């Protein structure tokens, strides 16, 4: 998951993209601190980090090597310096004649703010010390205020407008520079800068209102429900937390084996809340008003140049996918209902609270998949070594563990990796915050700390990212052992990290993962395909004690088990995406959000709507992925096509790996996604191609079926 998504809209001017080429800093630059005893890199993750003498005696470098951030007060220093430099760059932008230099100055302005904002955005939720979190939060507010001022600075806007209005000048620019200029203009216009003063003020007010409503709605999506104990049967009360005479229902309890527990949790947790309903309605109407006001109708799915391009194309994609899934989904529901009848004959109707539980029961019964059987073969160090082997053979990239300086990391468990290309040298740094700790966010995610870009002196600003997971700690007797799901998540997040390392653009505004949302998940989902291929897994999955390799049959069964009821799960995602599109379509909405939910569920899912529930009020993705929830399905379709066309025959094919880097990773967000996809696949895929790619992934592997039936 890309947590940068929220920042991308809160700090619109703090764009996305980075720069070109790095000359020969390879071995020598990181040899100083790379420990040769940590070769292969996996060894660094299979032992607890030990303190070094320079941890105690050496100078304090500050978080991520930023000298000011050795203390929380350093955020104030960093933001003040950024704001001073911002004022100087604004003057430069306004006094420079229109040309390519205009875009470079805008990008430096974006970088100046993002280097504080992006770092603070991570620290405010990822740092274990409250003082650092609070200082980072204040820095986010300060930079956010400046961004809003810049987005409504008429003189700054006009300096960019002069460039875009000059057709001859624009035609003389390269495609990446033109796209970055257009993206900066989009950021201005979504703030209403091109409107008269009264409308511009309304646009600013609407932006503020949308931010406030988004925050309130997001909080409401997780708000627990308290009910009096006597309202639930006594024999299921122990499944819920107690608060005096009340029970606390804080989720759907989707994996509970008792049908009544799941039913009660579903009906109570999703019971309509009038305040939350009003908040959602105001959020949707405010977004529509803003889109009308600034001239982006309907509510924009993000900056221009997505894969889908239009809401009509998105709905066409979802409708065709739903049609192709229909029969498979019906069979999945029949299979789940059969299992429910077998286990609970008195109450056998399949309901919306049933699929997660019964699909798991069927999966376990059919394939005997017990995650604990896999864990001894999947030590964290082995998985990291597997990634290292894969990146080296595909892309010529090696990961080196470095010893961080005192104060550089926020927790002793954080590992620092230098990413080095065999001929281009040092590409950037990945900080691996992989282990559980108190008050750490539970979501696995990727943060951009510093985007790459080509600087004025010709050197390259190296990208820096953080990967955050929640893995168990190693014990005295064994290293950190991963379940198959944890291993797949690790590969997924490393896909984002390598996109950041190899998306080496000229402009920070479009560096690495700073690209349209419906393309951003392609590199990470593609890595999931590698993690499920035995030829890749066999390179590293060995028992941490005996060295015995993970049997091929176990990998095959695991992969096939993921296809159990997968059509029904994909159909659910289609329903969510369609609901999101309708909510952000034509306004005013013809019916209430709950009536729309009921109709959309009937059309796009297949299980009945439950009266007196309002699932949409718990749909947190309506905030960060408003009108963009389809993106995950679209990205998965592209990743599936790339896998089948380019890597299925040989997952270590270096020529295919180099083409993947050249055609897809290297451009970040500096090139339209469809052009990147076309370059990679050597064809322009249609909506039908995307749909077929997703549906074909659901087909069973008959070799595994035959093997298991013997």
Swiss-Prot record:
Name of the encoding gene: Mipep
Active site: 493
Reported function: Cleaves proteins, imported into the mitochondrion, to their mature size.
GO MF term set: endopeptidase activity; metal ion binding; metalloendopeptidase activity
Family, per entry: Belongs to the peptidase M3 family.
Localization annotation: Mitochondrion matrix
EC nos: 3.4.24.59
Alphabetical GO biological process terms: peptide metabolic process; protein processing involved in protein targeting to mitochondrion
A cellular-component GO term for this protein: mitochondrial matrix
Keywords per UniProt: Acetylation, Calcium, Cobalt, Hydrolase, Iron, Magnesium, Manganese, Metal-binding, Metalloprotease, Mitochondrion, Protease, Transit peptide, Zinc
Cofactor binding: number and manner: Binds 1 zinc ion.
Regulation: Activity is divalent cation-dependent. It is stimulated by manganese, magnesium or calcium ions and reversibly inhibited by zinc, cobalt and iron.
Chemical reaction(s) catalysed: Release of an N-terminal octapeptide as second stage of processing of some proteins imported into the mitochondrion
Domain of life: Eukaryota
Pfam families: Peptidase_M3 (PF01432)
PROSITE patterns referenced in this protein's UniProt entry, alphabetically: ZINC_PROTEASE (PS00142)
Residue positions, PTM N6-acetyllysine: 124
The protein's required cofactors: Zn(2+)
Protein name: Mitochondrial intermediate peptidase
InterPro entries linked: M3A_MIP, MetalloPept_cat_dom_sf, Neurolysin/TOP_dom2, Pept_M3A_M3B, Pept_M3A_M3B_dom
Quaternary assembly: Monomer.
Source organism per UniProt: Rattus norvegicus (Rat)
Binding site for Zn(2+): 492, 496, 499
Transit peptide, UniProt annotation: 1-33
């Amino acid at each position: 998951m890309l947590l940068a998504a929220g920042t991308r809209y809160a700090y619109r001017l703090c764009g996305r993209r980075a720069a070109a080429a790095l000359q020969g800093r390879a071995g020598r630059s990181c040899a100083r601190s790379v420990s040769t005893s940590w070769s292969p890199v996996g060894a660094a993750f299979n032992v607890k980090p030990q303190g070094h003498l320079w941890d105690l005696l050496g100078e304090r470098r500050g978080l991520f090597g930023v000298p000011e951030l050795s203390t929380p007060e350093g955020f104030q220093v960093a933001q003040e310096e950024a704001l001073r430099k911002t004022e100087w760059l604004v003057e430069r932008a306004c006094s420079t004649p229109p040309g390519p230099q205009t875009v470079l100055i805008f990008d430096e302005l974006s970088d100046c703010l993002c280097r504080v904002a992006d770092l603070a955005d991570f620290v405010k939720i990822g740092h274990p010390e409250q003082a650092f979190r609070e200082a980072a939060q204040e820095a986010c507010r300060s930079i956010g205020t400046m961004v809003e001022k810049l987005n409504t600075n008429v003189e700054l806007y006009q300096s960019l407008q002069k460039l875009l209005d000059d057709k001859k000048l624009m035609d003389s620019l390269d495609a990446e520079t033109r796209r970055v200029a257009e993206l900066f203009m989009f950021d201005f216009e979504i703030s209403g800068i091109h409107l008269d003063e009264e409308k511009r003020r309304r646009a600013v007010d609407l932006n503020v209102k949308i931010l406030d409503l988004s925050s309130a709605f997001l909080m409401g999506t997780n708000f627990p429900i308290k009910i009096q104990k006597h309202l639930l049967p006594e024999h299921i009360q122990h499944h819920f937390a107690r608060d005096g005479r009340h029970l606390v229902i804080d989720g759907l309890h989707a994996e509970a084996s008792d049908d009544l527990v799941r039913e009660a949790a579903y009906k109570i947790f999703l019971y309509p809340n009038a305040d939350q309903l009003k908040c959602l309605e105001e959020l949707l109407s405010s977004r529509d008003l803003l889109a009308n006001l600034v001239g982006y109708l309907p509510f924009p799915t993000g900056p221009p140049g997505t894969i889908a391009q239009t809401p009509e194309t998105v709905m066409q994609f979802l409708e065709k996918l739903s049609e192709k899934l229909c029969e498979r989904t019906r069979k999945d529901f029949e299979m789940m209902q059969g299992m429910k009848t077998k286990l609970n004959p008195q109450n056998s109707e399949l309901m919306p609270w049933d699929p997660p539980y019964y699909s798991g029961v069927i999966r376990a019964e059919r394939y005997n998949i017990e995650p604990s059987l896999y864990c001894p073969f999947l030590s964290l160090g082995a998985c990291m070594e597997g990634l290292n082997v894969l990146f080296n053979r595909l892309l010529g990239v090696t990961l080196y563990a470095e010893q961080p300086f005192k104060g550089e990391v926020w927790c002793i468990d954080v590992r620092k990796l230098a990413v080095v290309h065999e001929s281009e040298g040092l590409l950037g740094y990945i900080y691996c915050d992989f282990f559980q700790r108190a008050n750490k966010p539970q979501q696995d995610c990727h943060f951009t700390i510093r985007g790459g870009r080509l600087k004025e002196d010709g050197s390259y600003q190296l990208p820096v990212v953080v990967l955050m997971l929640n893995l168990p700690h190693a014990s005295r007797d064994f290293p950190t052992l991963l379940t198959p799901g944890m291993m797949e998540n690790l590969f997924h997040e490393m896909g984002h990290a390598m996109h950041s390392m190899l998306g080496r653009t000229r402009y920070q505004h479009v560096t690495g993962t700073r690209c349209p949302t419906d393309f951003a998940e392609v590199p990470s989902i593609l890595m999931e395909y590698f993690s499920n291929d035995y030829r890749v897994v066999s390179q590293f999955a060995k028992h941490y004690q005996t060295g015995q390799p993970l049997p091929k049959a176990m990998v095959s069964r695991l992969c096939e088990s993921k296809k159990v009821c997968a059509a029904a799960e994909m159909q659910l995602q289609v329903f969510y995406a369609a609901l999101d599109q309708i909510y952000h379509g034509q306004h005013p909405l013809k019916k209430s959000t709950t009536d729309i939910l009921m109709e959309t569920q009937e059309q796009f899912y297949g299980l009945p709507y439950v009266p007196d529930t309002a699932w949409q009020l718990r749909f947190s993705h309506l905030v960060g992925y408003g009108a963009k929830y389809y993106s995950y399905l679209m990205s998965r379709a592209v990743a599936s096509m790339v896998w089948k066309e380019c890597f299925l025959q040989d997952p270590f094919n270096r020529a295919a790996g180099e083409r993947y880097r050249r055609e897809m990773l290297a451009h970040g967000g500096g090139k339209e996604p469809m052009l990147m996809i076309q370059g990679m696949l050597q064809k322009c895929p249609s909506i039908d191609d995307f749909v077929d790619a997703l549906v074909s992934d659901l087909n069973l592997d008959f070799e595994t079926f035959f093997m298991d039936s013997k």
